[in-house]
């Protein structure tokens, strides 16, 4: 391959062939979707001008934001563990951290982290880090998003919004029956967001009477699916792109959407067994309190 022309060769022998069309030999080329590790695939040694995407019948130039997002996504270590310069323990909402630590101890009663001070706890969790080469330290992207104060989050991630809309039982003159968004009444970090929306999402779900031995089981497969969908929306979001973590509760179902494209092809997701978290540290923070699993 001429690396001066194209950045990566993703074609295999099976992607090229020929066929007979009305007596004429036609060469066909199937261009597969590139693995996230190789994106963006670009030409002429210029990713900003040489990256294209196929939208149905045409190829389009990728925007600068799309190119940057692909470079960030190429890392296997995720995008939420980087040190945020200038963001310190002063930017942590202590009430959020206290609530999380109580829940953490409930799920991990014998864990040694329960007895360490807040900064060390956050460092072990991946929410706080120290650059060993420069000795600079501070919150990671995961730490600020999960436990940060509203103002600090807006200063660094003003490109991201969180929005919950309940569109059930609406009247002709209303667009929603309940809404949770930025209004200054709550610290809009990810922990507060998920803890506020989950009860709202499952409040109307039926809980058939079930027993596990002599203990009533209130959790159902639907409850678990809704929780998993909400957590997946958060841990797979691209917080470096502009967009909304949006949750809609409708009469006939739920809608979860987030900024960013899929790291894996849709076919691979449906096949199962393929799992790449965009924000593994945030994922682990939820897993440690019983929300979501590492697959």
Across the structure, where does each feature detected by a protein language model lie?
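Short, surface-exposed charged micro-motifs
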Residues: 15-17, 154, 244-246
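Active-site helix-to-loop segments that bind/position phosphate- or nucleotide-bearing substrates
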Residues: 34, 50-241, 249-277, 290-295
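Divalent-cation
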Residues: 1-46, 55
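Short, solvent-exposed secondary-structure boundary motifs
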Residues: 2-9, 235-238, 287
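Beta-strand-connecting loop/turn residues
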Residues: 23-25, 243, 252
């Amino acid at each position: 391959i001429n690396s001066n022309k194209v950045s990566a060769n993703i074609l295999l022998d099976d992607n090229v062939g020929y066929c007979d069309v009305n007596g004429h030999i036609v060469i066909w080329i199937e261009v597969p979707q590139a693995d996230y590790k190789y994106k963006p695939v670009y030409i002429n040694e210029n990713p900003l001008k040489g990256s294209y995407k196929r939208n149905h019948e045409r190829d389009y130039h990728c925007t600068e934001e799309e190119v940057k997002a692909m470079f960030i996504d190429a890392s296997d270590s995720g995008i939420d563990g980087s040190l945020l310069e200038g963001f310190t323990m002063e930017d942590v909402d202590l009430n959020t951290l206290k609530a999380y630590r109580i829940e953490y101890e409930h799920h991990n009663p014998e864990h040694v982290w329960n007895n360490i001070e807040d900064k060390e706890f956050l460092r072990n969790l991946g929410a706080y880090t120290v650059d060993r080469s420069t000795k600079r330290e501070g919150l990671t992207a995961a730490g600020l998003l999960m436990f940060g104060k509203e103002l600090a989050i807006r200063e660094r991630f003003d490109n991201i919004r969180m929005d919950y809309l309940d569109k059930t039982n609406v009247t002709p003159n209303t667009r929603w029956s309940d809404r949770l968004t930025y209004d200054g009444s709550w610290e809009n970090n990810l922990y507060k967001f998920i803890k506020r929306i989950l009860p709202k999402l499952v409040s109307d779900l039926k809980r058939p009477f079930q027993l596990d031995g002599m203990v009533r089981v209130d959790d159902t497969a639907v409850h678990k699916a809704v929780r998993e969908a909400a957590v997946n929306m958060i841990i797979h979001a691209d917080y470096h792109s502009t967009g909304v973590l949006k949750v809609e509760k409708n009469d006939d179902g739920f809608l979860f959407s987030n900024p960013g494209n899929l790291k894996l092809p849709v076919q691979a997701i449906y096949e199962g067994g393929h799992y790449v978290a965009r924000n593994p540290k945030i994922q682990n923070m939820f897993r440690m309190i019983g929300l979501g699993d590492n697959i």
